[in-house]
Amino acid sequence: MNRLAAAGAAAALTAVLTHPATATAASNTATTAIPVDPATNIEMHVTANCVSAENRCYFDTTANLTTPDGPTGFPGDTWARQTITIRSSSRDVWQEASYSAPSGNPREVKGANHENVLSKMYKAINNVEISITYFGGGPIERFKADGDSVPTDWATGRPNTQAAFFACSQIQVVYGGVNLTTPTACAQTTFN
């Protein structure tokens, strides 16, 4: 009886090892918040998603106020500065990135002014930093940014799908007696 059980276990193990699970796109989301008052928070949301079939990672960020009535945009007298940092876990990987701020506008690789939202991208050896300045408040959609990046190996010039991908963001928000900066929200993912 024990031999039969051992043979069955060996057959099951062989089946598992010869038919590994298929990999899908890897995605991760992070959220941070800072209280404005007992009923209101400023939130920063970040999502990172790497797609193996495209050798490309995508990121999006959203900033909003959360009130007892739910998420909402910012008041009309708002001034805000958001920083997005895109990087890899490997110092030998640089990011070939583009972004839209606010989301839905044409992709940028340098900087732009869309709807009084000024943005600029700074490239370094192994990361990309996007600075977005908002003049005036509005709905949540105004405070969304998105983009994509191909993590590229310095030595080969080919996409690097082995290292982890990080998308991090924080925002400083100033309006009517409020001047607060959210903690940094970082989403980390891989290609598998």
Description of each model-found segment:
Residues 1-25:
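Secretory targeting and sorting signals
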Residues 28-120, 179:
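Short, surface-exposed binding/anchoring microloops in extracellular/periplasmic proteins
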Residues 45, 151-155, 185:
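Short structured motifs
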Residues 49-51, 56-58, 167-169, 185-189:
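Sequence contexts marking disulfide-bonded cysteines in secreted/extracellular proteins
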Residues 58, 124-154:
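Aromatic sugar-binding surface patches on proteins
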Residues 114-127, 170-177:
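Enriched for extracellular/lumenal, surface-exposed ectodomains of secreted and cell-surface proteins
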Residues 146-154, 158-176:
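Internal, hydrophobic beta-strand segments that form the core of beta-sheet-rich folds
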Residues 176-192:
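Short beta-strand elements
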